[in-house]
């Protein structure tokens, strides 16, 4: 029976599933918006939100402690290593801690938004955009006359 089993399998081995979500997490952090299937987006939300919370904790430490103190450095490195242990992407970890910690400092959770966007052409799988809320809008160069 499947009682109290968390997570979805997606027809993949556990190592394939872990690798897929590590890559998707790094992509979401780097691009702040990705398109994927709805079940994957729902599962990804549960993975990315704790990573943003790590960045918020480091931002809070940065405000409370002197950034040159050994206590701050030790805790900051520990938090970054926890994030890197999952992501395995230096650029994503840097962006996570440098941008998202400050951006979501006042938000108490709910850092991602899932927007349904129809069905995939080939197999009618439900598709969705998953994005980080409060992301800066990219201004498109539109010629208005």
Curated annotation (Swiss-Prot):
Belongs to the bacterial ribosomal protein bL17 family. The keyword Ribosomal protein applies. SUPFAM superfamilies: Prokaryotic ribosomal protein L17. One of its GO terms (biological process) is translation. GO terms for molecular function: structural constituent of ribosome. It comes from the Bacteria. The keyword Aminoacyl-tRNA synthetase does not apply. This is Large ribosomal subunit protein bL17. Part of the 50S ribosomal subunit. Contacts protein L32. Pfam families: Ribosomal_L17. NCBIfam families: L17 (TIGR00059). HAMAP family: Ribosomal_bL17. It comes from Francisella tularensis subsp. tularensis (strain SCHU S4 / Schu 4).
């Amino acid at each position: 029976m499947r009682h109290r089993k968390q997570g979805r399998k997606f027809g993949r081995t556990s190592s394939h599933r872990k690798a897929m979500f590590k890559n998707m997490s790094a992509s979401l952090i780097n691009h702040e918006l990705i398109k994927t299937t709805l079940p994957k987006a729902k599962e990804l939300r549960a993975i990315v939100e704790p990573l943003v919370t790590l960045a918020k904790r480091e931002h809070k430490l940065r405000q409370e402690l002197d950034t040159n103190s050994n206590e701050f450095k030790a805790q900051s490195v520990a938090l970054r290593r926890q994030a890197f242990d999952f992501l395995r992407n230096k650029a994503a970890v840097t962006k996570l801690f440098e941008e998202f910690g400050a951006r979501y400092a006042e938000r108490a959770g709910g850092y991602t938004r899932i927007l349904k966007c129809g069905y995939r052409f080939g197999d009618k799988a439900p598709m969705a955009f998953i994005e980080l809320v409060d992301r800066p809008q990219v201004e498109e160069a539109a010629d208005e006359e």
